[in-house]
Each structure stands twice: as C-alpha cells, then as structure tokens.
C-alpha cells in the first residue's frame, strides 16, 4: 500500500485530522470524503489505487469522526463540514499549484461532496459520488419520527458481499457503533433540502457509482437526487449485486477501474 502521513488543522468546530498519500509529481489531486460513522483510514485501498494512477490523495476525518475533535457523529450544520473540506482542498492546492482537483465522496460524503460542488464547483475538475445520500432517503424520515433515535447499529453485512469487510468494520474502534444523534439527522434533512434548492452541477464531469442491492442508501432514492442535480456531463455505473460500499465490494477493482477511466477522460489533455 502507498505510504501515508497525517496532519491536523483547525476546522470550524475544532481540530481535524487529515491523512495524505503523497505523490512526487501528481497528475491530479484526489480528495476523499468519507461517510457517516466511519473514518478516512478505511480508504487505504482506494487511496493506493489512486496514487498508482498518478494522484496525490488527501482525506479528512470529519468533525466528530475518526481522530478529529468533537462529540462522536454529532454534526449540527453540514455547511461547516463543506467548509472543512474546502480547507483540505486549499491545502492540497498549495502543495500542488495548478494541479486539477477531483473530489470523491461516499454515502454521507456524497451529500457533502455534492454540496461542495454546488458551492465551489469552480475548484473542481471532476466529482465522483458513491452511494450518495442525496434525494430521498427513507431511513432519515423513519429516524426523525422518533424523539430519540433507536439504537439500531448498521448491519455490517449490508456493506459488502465480502465478509472480511463487515468483520473489520464491526471490530474497528474508530467506527461509531452507537445510535444516530438527532441534531445530525436534522442537519442531514436541512442539507438535503439545500441541495435540492441549489440545483444542477452544470458542466462538471460527474460519475455516480452505486450498488444495485444497496439496502442502506437504496438506489431509487439516490436517483431522485441525481436527477435533480445532474448537469450536462453525468456518467453512471450501477453494479448488479453490489451493496453499499462499492469501493469495498468483491468487484472493487472493476469499480475503481471505472473511476480511474472516468478521471482520465475528465482531466485536461496536456
């Protein structure tokens, strides 16, 4: 695997940890935006593939996640998380001036990345969304019906057909295994509405990848968000039998081949 290093910065709500996988002469910068309850350390394989493809890779642990400060999984405003991701992008651009930037967001990270593209699309050469929480998410509606969300942990089997992935997730001390926090659910609802209100992504090359059998963020609900935000340059790849984490699926190399092929098309020709 590619070597990595960590640094911290002062984010909107405290100290945030960032992992970087360096490249001496990158063709592009990739910023990985992780999902709910997890951390950027779960993206080692993805980062390694991207480094070998010519990227300098960066990824923050969001507030309340992984090694970053904050009450666990407590997010009151996702606009703050978008601002933190912008800080990572600016750091990467300072280290690699003039190099194209690609943002890759998974699940809740897809929501954050979509909102980033709406706010700062001029920063980006391409956007990749994996199982994104955009559009209609029935899980959110169900959980918001409770005054206190029930303690219903994510079933590791819903992540991937590879049982090793589920076992590692269940045993990972940096993964949150408790209930959703109500402020986080309310912030998710607010941001879904904000994304719907702010419209399409214009000409930004966008790749949407999704598992057809995703039970956590079902395909049909995300499609409503994709249809509402897609611009003039959308590519979609739906993987039969795939579950929520297509980057950790049994066909992950196929998925990452699709990602790198898409990035090659999106990068400016020298």
Regions found by a protein language model. Give the residues of each.
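Active-site nucleophile loop of the alpha/beta-hydrolase fold
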Residues: 128-137
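Active-site glycine-rich loops that stabilize anionic/oxyanionic intermediates
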Residues: 27, 35-38, 212
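Short beta-strand/loop motif that positions the catalytic acidic residue
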Residues: 202, 208-210, 214
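Catalytic active-site module of serine/aspartate enzymes centered on a nucleophile-bearing elbow/loop
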Residues: 233-270
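Catalytic nucleophile-loop/oxyanion-hole region of alpha/beta-hydrolase
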Residues: 37-39, 66-96, 255
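Short alpha-helix in the alpha/beta-hydrolase fold that links the catalytic acid
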Residues: 218-227
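N-terminal cap/lid segment of alpha/beta-hydrolase-fold proteins
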Residues: 1-23
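Conserved alpha/beta-hydrolase
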Residues: 40, 47-70
